Amino acid sequence: MVAQSGVGTVSTKQARIAELARQMPGKAMCSLSHHMDQAWLHEAFRQTRKDGAVGVDGQSAAEYAADLGNNLRALEPRAKSGEYRAPPVRRAHIPKGDGSETRPIGVPTFEDKVLQRAVVMLLEPVYEQDFYDFSYGFRPGRSAHDALEALDRGLHELRGGWVLDVDIRSFFDSLDHEKLRQLLRQRVTDGVVVRLVGKWLNAGVLDGGVAVRAESGTPQGGVISPMLANIYLHEVLDVWWVQEVQPRLRGRSFLVRYADDFVMVFSEQEDALRVQRVLAKRFARFGLTLHPEKTRLVPFCRPPKSGGRPHTGSFDFLGFTHTWGRSRRGNWAVRRKTAKGRFTRALRTINQWLRSARHLPVEQQAIALGAKLRGHFQYYGILGNSVALSRFHYEVRCLWRKWLSRRSQRAYVTWDQMNRLLARYPLPPARLPWRSRQLWLANL
């Protein structure tokens, strides 16, 4: 009952925080944590995902929820008094791109996730008044598809141009703790909030049973990490771009950022080269390094109407490879398809799951595979990507047949048998759930 009755109270408090932040641009908010009462913590619990992996204490969401009232009543005074000790995060490694590298993910304890969510709920209404419209990552009411839509519209308005495709090396592991604290205190000086953020930055990680204290970085996977990343890059990149870079450019330009993944687009090559030269120096001042091989300037000008094949490059952004292609009316339009690395990684993940689940009943496999396919199509199902979606659907069917054939020495499944199985347990077809939002592209 506390959680349900407190939702309206929490949203009202957040609206007040937002209004104060809007009335005091550039000034520090010194009183936020008094809002973090039991209703606030119950709402933070409600918003916290319950299906995630467990942290170093091994406690699941269900186990924490079994005594939720007492747990939250004990958490509030510890969080506000400074007695709360942030536990180290459990480190896991997941493959990146084509699998040649891995990305470290930090898994906090469930209680830590709840408290981090509560602090995010305090910071969000403040920083939403400051963040620019071209920033899309981990913000309320914004998504990766919104960022892709903004990029498409900008490219068509500029008729292409020069794309600075930027890759920050190990961004989440490279955040300078002291600089992050300084940037945070420019807008928030509430002692409880600043202290809790400091505890999370200093908590360290448990990697393979070995405790490691990190002097920089914030673990990916933490609830607070995306907010801290946005605060950092808002000052390091966004404000710099708006106040110092764009006023000095000769031509038109725009920036689209999703967390640490961003592209800059310029109508003039000279502008692009100038920014490319100074960007690395700017980032180095804040402890960040650009990947020398993955950061590149891509010619992406729209070909002439009467021209043949475009003599331009391509670039990847948010899992899609962007190129120029012909629309249904024969005009040039930006085309997007699933990036090769993402395609390969998604298939590898399904292959690994099928291997581990090959002895489950076929009906259970079909249900799980259907959910995985729907998730893939939900993200990659955009206009112009139907070929990649159909191919992915076909490859998944092939993988399923392969692992069904390996259930035993006598379990070989022919394609006739597989087709009968698919008729009984059909997988969801390749769909374009984002088609309606992008029909304007098809009519160019």
Give the label of every model feature segment:
Residues 1-444:
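Non-catalytic terminal/accessory segments
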